[in-house]
């Protein structure tokens, strides 16, 4: 008769203030966090917006500068005006709290992903706010309040939502959109809306899978540049 196998060793308790990883016998664990951006994140936000302009084939419209973003993005409390959530990833668990920049306005979201293959990110050094802890910025969402007269409720308008190329199709975009939607529900808002380029069929399919309606009958109207400045000389 075969001898009984020895009992398995006890599972080590997670370290204090650390997010315990999911247990999986296979795969490559990746830890993610969504947090409020701060002024120190402006260089990463600027790079992300530029990469988004490249992806959307709209670099001819891109003129944002780091100084311009720094002077306009953080003038009000989060959710009262322009707000940015940053998506960060790491091969190590994140601390459960952000002691360097605590905020009473938002509690960060954490998630553990078990990937089939490791992620190859050749630009990680350009997007690392904390190189010592292997943290990399993988995406962002920029949004602000608007108002629906039909609902008589405020809502959120998403100006930008973007995930860097190495991190796409891994659930990170869903995390960013969910974070905004959850905040809208928490604040009693009536809707979240945004626009999508008509050629971006992958994004359209993704948004529909998330429950969004694509409003075919609406068109975006925009005054900007010289057309906007010309109104300075128009008498009312």
UniProtKB/Swiss-Prot annotation:
Gene Ontology cellular component annotations, sorted alphabetically: cytosol; nucleus
Top enzyme class: transferase
SUPFAM superfamilies the UniProt entry points to: Acyl-CoA N-acyltransferases (Nat)
Keyword Hydrolase: no
Tissue distribution of the protein: Expressed throughout the plant.
Pfam entry (one): Acetyltransf_1
Catalytic activity: an N-terminal L-alpha-aminoacyl-[protein] + acetyl-CoA = N-terminal N(alpha)-acetyl-L-alpha-aminoacyl-[protein] + CoA + H(+); L-lysyl-[protein] + acetyl-CoA = N(6)-acetyl-L-lysyl-[protein] + CoA + H(+)
Highest rank taxon of the organism: Eukaryota
EC number: 2.3.1.48
GO molecular function, one term: protein-N-terminal amino-acid acetyltransferase activity
CDD domains: NAT_SF
Location within or outside the cell: Cytoplasm; Nucleus
Swiss-Prot/TrEMBL keywords: Acyltransferase, Cytoplasm, Nucleus, Transferase
Record domain N-acetyltransferase: where: 96-235
Residues at the active site: 207 (proton donor)
UniProt binding sites for acetyl-CoA: 161-163, 169-174, 200-202, 207
InterPro entries linked: Acyl_CoA_acyltransferase, Diverse_Substrate_AcTransf, GNAT_dom
Subunit annotation: Oligomer.
Its biological purpose: Probable protein acetyltransferase with dual specificity triggering both N-alpha-acetylation (NTA) and epsilon-lysine acetylation (KA).
Family: Belongs to the acetyltransferase family. GNAT subfamily.
Protein's name according to its UniProt entry: GCN5-related N-acetyltransferase 8
Source species of the chain: Arabidopsis thaliana
Gene: GNAT8
């Amino acid at each position: 008769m075969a001898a009984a196998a020895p009992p398995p060793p006890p599972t080590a308790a997670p370290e204090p203030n650390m997010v315990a990883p999911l247990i999986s016998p296979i795969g490559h664990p990746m830890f993610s966090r969504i947090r409020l951006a701060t002024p120190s994140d402006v260089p990463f936000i600027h790079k992300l917006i530029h990469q988004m302009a490249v992806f959307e084939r709209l670099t001819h419209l891109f003129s944002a500068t780091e100084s311009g973003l720094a002077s306009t993005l953080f003038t009000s409390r989060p959710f009262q005006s322009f707000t940015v959530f940053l998506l960060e990833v790491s091969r190590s668990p994140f601390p459960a709290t952000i002691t360097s920049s605590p905020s009473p306005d938002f509690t960060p979201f954490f998630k553990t992903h078990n990937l089939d293959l490791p992620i190859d990110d050749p630009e990680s050094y350009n997007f690392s706010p904390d190189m010592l802890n292997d943290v990399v910025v993988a995406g962002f969402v920029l949004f602000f309040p608007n108002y629906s007269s039909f609902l008589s409720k405020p809502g959120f308008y998403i100006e930008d939502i973007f995930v860097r190329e190495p991190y796409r199709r891994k659930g990170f975009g869903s995390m960013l959109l969910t974070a905004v939607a959850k905040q809208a529900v928490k604040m009693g808002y009536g809707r979240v809306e945004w626009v999508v380029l008509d050629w971006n069929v992958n994004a359209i399919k993704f948004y529909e899978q998330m429950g969004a309606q694509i409003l075919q009958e609406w068109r975006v109207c925009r005054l900007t540049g010289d057309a906007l400045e010309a109104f300075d000389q128009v008498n009312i």
